[in-house]
A protein has these predicted regions:
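Conserved RecA-like P-loop NTPase helicase motor core
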Residues: 122, 129, 290-385
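Inter-Walker segment of RecA-like/P-loop motor cores
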Residues: 63-110
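SF2 helicase catalytic motif II
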Residues: 114-152
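Conserved Walker A/P-loop ATP-binding site and its immediately adjacent core
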Residues: 24, 41-64, 271-277
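Conserved C-terminal RecA-like helicase domain
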Residues: 92, 233-321
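Walker A/P-loop
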Residues: 7-28, 266
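Interdomain helical connector at the RecA1-RecA2 junction of SF1/SF2 helicase-like NTPases
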Residues: 164-264
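Conserved helix-turn-beta segment of the N-terminal RecA-like "Helicase ATP-binding" lobe
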Residues: 53-77, 283, 288
Length: 385
């Protein structure tokens, strides 16, 4: 309220991963509806995501909390929505429009005549560290859609520092700070506070046992002797290496369930490549555990959703992934993350915090480190904790 009264219409809310940013948006809808009503203004709320699975997840959560949700199916629908002057629905509930940022186009711009009615549009940008790049056309379209809009960027990991390419290599001369795009921080809620308040768990990094390190190293050496020079991705997807890796993972997972006296915990295996993910999934079939392979080109969307829901309900032991589900995925029973590749900066923090959701009486989430992320983990801690 103080920011709005001071004429500030944009900024970042940095709340740690897992602390409930969708819930925060919900409470803001309630509060800001009343705030603008007192000023004779109609508030129109938009929750903006960059992935279809997050759209469905957010819409479901808003409905569960009692909001009326408008879901946008096309750019044409969105053009009609943003040009409309009201938020009327037959339920009497407050309304929020959940929309993919790709629906913003050059045509979805509020015309001067639309300002004749007292309307205040409020945009909540979910996961604002990710796809809202200052050079991207989607963000440019969003920012120009309504010059008077209030823009609240929600993130658990604002982008700070070096930008990396898709292979994880730093791009020379490229730096990024979310504040340069969305404005200063409106509010911050750090990891230590979130842990102290019981909203998230501490993370423990577990190294690999020395005997298994030797076995994995030996497997790599034997592959190189048999096959000659292979690139890293081929080595790590080779059956001999995958066999040793899966043996370790399944043994560790079994021991963890015994040590925690809890058969309900789940695991996620973050693979070095999609080829390795496929190989690990096949190898897991030899063990008395259940697993689902989650890759963008494996199965259709409904099948993947069914597998993800089954994991959340506890009927699948492992999710095997490469890039998918490392952000925006929430499953409290996920307590063991098997990390098979180096991930950088905010992307690393996003991945690690898949295991920080409160569950039963757990105090920790566990990261089993096959990739030796110690240096990256320390660097990320300094930037975000």
């Amino acid at each position: 309220e103080n920011k709005l009264n001071a004429g500030i219409k944009n900024g970042i809310i940095w709340h740690t991963q897992g602390s409930g940013k969708t819930a925060l948006a919900y409470y803001n809808v309630r509060y800001l509806t009343d705030y603008y009503q007192k000023r004779g203004t109609i508030a129109k709320f938009y929750f903006i995501v960059d992935r279809l699975d997050l759209l469905t997840q957010a819409a479901d959560e808003f409905r569960a909390r009692g909001l009326h949700v408008d879901e946008i199916d096309s750019k044409e629908d969105f053009i009609r929505n943003i040009h409309s002057t009201g938020t009327v629905n037959n339920t009497g509930k407050p309304t929020i429009t959940v929309v993919n940022i790709q629906k913003f186009s050059k045509e979805s711009i509020v015309k001067q005549s639309d300002y004749a009615v007292n309307i205040q549009r409020i945009y909540f940008l979910d996961e604002a560290h990710r796809s809202y790049k200052p050079t991207g056309s989607f963000l440019a379209n969003l920012l120009s859609s309504d010059r008077e809009a209030v823009i609240i960027a929600l993130t658990g990991t604002p982008l700070i520092g070096t930008i990396y390419d898709d292979e994880g290599k730093p791009i020379a001369g490229k730096k990024y700070d979310s504040k340069s795009v969305f404005g200063n921080y409106i509010h911050k809620y750090y990891y230590n506070r979130s842990i102290a308040d019981g909203y998230t768990l501490k993370l423990i990094r577990e190294g690999i046992e020395t005997t298994y390190k030797k076995k994995l190293k030996k497997a790599l050496e034997e592959i190189e002797m048999l096959k000659g020079s292979l690139d890293k991705k081929e080595l790590y997807a080779h059956p001999k290496y995958v066999s040793a890796l899966v043996r370790y993972i399944t043994d560790d997972f079994r021991k963890s369930r015994i040590a925690m006296n809890d058969q309900s915990i789940g695991g996620m295996i973050v693979c070095d490549s999609s080829a390795q993910a496929r190989a690990i999934f096949e190898e897991l079939k030899s063990y008395p555990c259940s697993a689902a392979l989650i890759l963008h080109d494996v199965d259709d969307k409904e099948t993947r959703k069914g597998n993800i829901d089954a994991f959340k309900k506890g009927t699948i032991d492992f999710l095997v992934v490469y890039n998918m589900l490392l952000t925006g995925f929430d499953a409290p029973r996920l307590k063991k993350l098997y990390l098979g590749r180096i991930i950088k900066d905010h992307n690393l923090l996003q991945a690690l915090t898949r295991v920080n959701r409160p569950y039963k009486n757990y105090r920790y989430g566990y990261v089993v480190d096959f990739a030796d992320i110690r240096a990256e983990f320390d660097k990320t801690n300094k930037a975000y904790f």
